[in-house]
Amino acid sequence: MSAAVLLSVLFALACGQAASFCIPTEYTMYVDRRECAYCLTINTTICAGYCMTRDINGKLFLPKYALSQDVCTYRDFIYRTVEIPGCPHHVTPYFSFPVAVSCKCGKCNTDNSDCIHEAVRTNYCTKPQSFYLGGFSV
């Protein structure tokens, strides 16, 4: 293998490791309220991807804030509100959710993100579905 090819491969690997791939990603979620007749399928965007992290040796000697890792999180987002069809009059039929506009690698903000790794939850409807298409329910 020539030196130029070897150098270009090493350069590509180094750039791939240093770059963060944290971008808005399409995501489908299902809103299922017990009291309402329908489940609402919502297409939105969330922040997902890879952020560069390091595991520090000598963790015993560092303060806790120095041990936190960067995560892929919201830089800018907006909230959208939809109406879940088939809800009785005594139930509030509105559901608000964040839509990622741009993302960044940074500390997790508990004001707008779930920062705890949970077990995988089922993400499906248990009732007939109604779809939300960006401005109105169908």
Swiss-Prot record:
Q: Which PROSITE patterns match?
A: GLYCO_HORMONE_BETA_1, GLYCO_HORMONE_BETA_2
Q: What Pfam families does the record point to?
A: Cys_knot (PF00007)
Q: Which UniProt keywords apply?
A: Disulfide bond, Glycoprotein, Hormone, Secreted, Signal
| Compartments (UniProt record) | Secreted
Pull one GO CC term from this UniProt entry. Answer: extracellular region
Give all cystine bridges in this chain. Answer: 22-72, 36-87, 39-125, 47-103, 51-105, 108-115
Q: Which GO terms describe its molecular function?
A: hormone activity
Q: Which SMART domains match?
A: GHB
Q: Where is the major localization of this protein?
A: secreted
The protein's matches in InterPro entries, at most eight in alphabetical order, are given as: Cystine-knot_cytokine (IPR029034), Glyco_hormone_CN (IPR006208), Gonadotropin_bsu (IPR001545), Gonadotropin_bsu_CS (IPR018245)
Q: Please list the residues that make up the propeptide.
A: 133-138
As given in the record, the signal peptide range reads 1-20
**What does the subunit section of this Swiss-Prot or TrEMBL entry state?**
Heterodimer of a common alpha chain and a unique beta chain which confers biological specificity to thyrotropin, lutropin, follitropin and gonadotropin.
Q: Know the name of this protein?
A: Thyrotropin subunit beta
Species for this entry: Mus musculus
- The encoding gene is Tshb
